[in-house]
């Protein structure tokens, strides 16, 4: 039995007058497993928390373990998982929270659907070539998928439909985490 993925400590609710961000927003990180979605989202979470923003991180692995347990990896199950994440993100954003979603969310039409339903949503494409994510994969899942041992593996035996027009495109094989966070902060301040 595997341990449940850990969640970062929550920034407690701030009284309405003390909130830095009055309107909530959703930053949706999408990309292949190992591209750096969770790494960037966690680093941004820490920075926004330090600035006093009400912020939450919804990590795809943690959501799958806690909210979407029992779902498989069919197209329908993946879409259901993405819609559940979007529902929770929307509830939080409605109450002035900046929500960082880190989820593969492989299908473009489902991403468009959920992003259109969310307030102040930004789509961030976290991009790294298959060779790079395979090298980063400490569990060896990509090698197993490439050998045919893992069916329905996004980017290998199941499609990943890259965003055509993301709000921000971060190529993590070319930039540092710090550079990525600075680009994200710049984009977030542009949208305020």
Curated annotation (Swiss-Prot):
Assigned keywords, A-Z: ATP-binding, Kinase, Nucleotide-binding, Phosphoprotein, Transferase
InterPro entries, A to Z: APS_kinase, P-loop_NTPase, Sulf_AdTrans/APS_kinase
EC numbers: 2.7.1.25
Residues annotated to bind ATP: 31-38
Active-site residue numbers: 105
Pathway(s) where this gene product acts: Sulfur metabolism; hydrogen sulfide biosynthesis; sulfite from sulfate: step 2/3
Disulfide bond sites: none
Catalysed reaction, written as an equation: adenosine 5'-phosphosulfate + ATP = 3'-phosphoadenylyl sulfate + ADP + H(+)
A GO MF term: sulfate adenylyltransferase (ATP) activity
Top-level EC class: transferase
NCBIfam families to which the protein is assigned, alphabetical: apsK, PRK00889.1, PRK03846.1
Descriptive protein name: Adenylyl-sulfate kinase
Gene that this polypeptide is encoded by: cysC
